Structures are given as C-alpha cells and as structure tokens.
Amino acid sequence: MSFPKEGSTIQIHSYKHNGKLHRIWEDTIVLKGTSKVVVAGNDRIIVREADGRNWRTREPAICYFDAEQWFNMICMLRADGIYYYCNLGTPFTWDEEALKYIDYDLDIKVYPDMTMKLLDEDEYELHSKLMKYPPELDVILRKSVDELISWIHQRKGPFAPQFVENWYERYLQYR
C-alpha cells in the first residue's frame, strides 16, 4: 500500500456507511505518512459538506489517523489548551486522491483537562437503522469507544504530553 509523502498537501474525505461522501477537508499537510499512521496538520482550511455548504476551521489542528484503529482525532490548538475531536470510523485508506475513512457518527470530545463527552449517540442510532449497520459493526464500534477512552486515560498516542505541540512545531516548518 502506498501512503502520502511527508510534506505533501492532501485532502481528507469522510464517507457514510452507504458510500456517500460526507465531508472534505482541504489543504492538509502530511507530517508523517506510513502504512500504519498518518499525522497531518492544517490551519483555517476550507471544509466542504456533502450538502454544498463550505466553512473554514478556526484554529490550527493536528490530525491523527491509524490504519488499525476504528477512530481518528483532530487535535485543535486553542488559546486555552488543546481540544480533541475524536471520530469513530473505519481505519484510514489512501488512494492517491485522498486519505479516506467511513464516519460512524459517534464522537468523543476531549477538553484540555482531559474530561470527555460522548457525542451523537442519537445520530448513530438513527443511521444504524437507516443504513442497516450490521450487528458486527456495532460490536466493533462499541469496543473502539472503549479503546479510545483507554487511550485518553493512559495519555496514549495524540493524548500523550507534548505529542500535539511537537507535531505542530513540525507543521510550522511547512507553512
């Protein structure tokens, strides 16, 4: 499997279970690209929604994608600390067009003090019925929520001290 090259600018595409495009993040710079992990950075980029709306992110962010985990993170650097928006979704794929994953609705927001909140359970329940998520998928996603919470408590991966700050310093070299 090929993977995005360090320093290259890519798009990130999220899809829904039914195969429809959900969201596109533009102009994201790859800081580390391997077959197992992609770390990327962006700042005030355009995000295109499937319904045609566009919006711009408000702050710099470090993005973390894992080829073996059913979650990814957007680590937002704000004046009062780092906020983490964790998406439950498939492990990433890379196909030269974009880094891609399927978004499965559930999210965990983590605050600078490492408190967290599980979001969008109602959206998950609705989409699981509408798009007929198989029972095996529910098992995988529930286990992934537990694994993600474990990472947060253990300060693993992007939650480790200095992880985001160190990658942000690398990102600034490419801006």
Swiss-Prot record:
Q: Which reaction does it catalyse?
A: a ribonucleoside 5'-triphosphate + H2O = a ribonucleoside 5'-diphosphate + phosphate + H(+); a ribonucleoside 5'-diphosphate + H2O = a ribonucleoside 5'-phosphate + phosphate + H(+)
Residue positions annotated to bind Mg(2+) 1 are: N87, D103, D107
Q: Any idea which GO molecular function terms this record carries?
A: magnesium ion binding; nucleoside diphosphate phosphatase activity; ribonucleoside triphosphate phosphatase activity
Q: Which domain of life is it from?
A: Bacteria
Purpose of the protein: Has nucleoside phosphatase activity towards nucleoside triphosphates and nucleoside diphosphates.
Protein family: Belongs to the Ntdp family.
Record protein name field: Nucleoside triphosphate/diphosphate phosphatase
Organism from which the protein derives: Shouchella clausii (strain KSM-K16) (Alkalihalobacillus clausii)
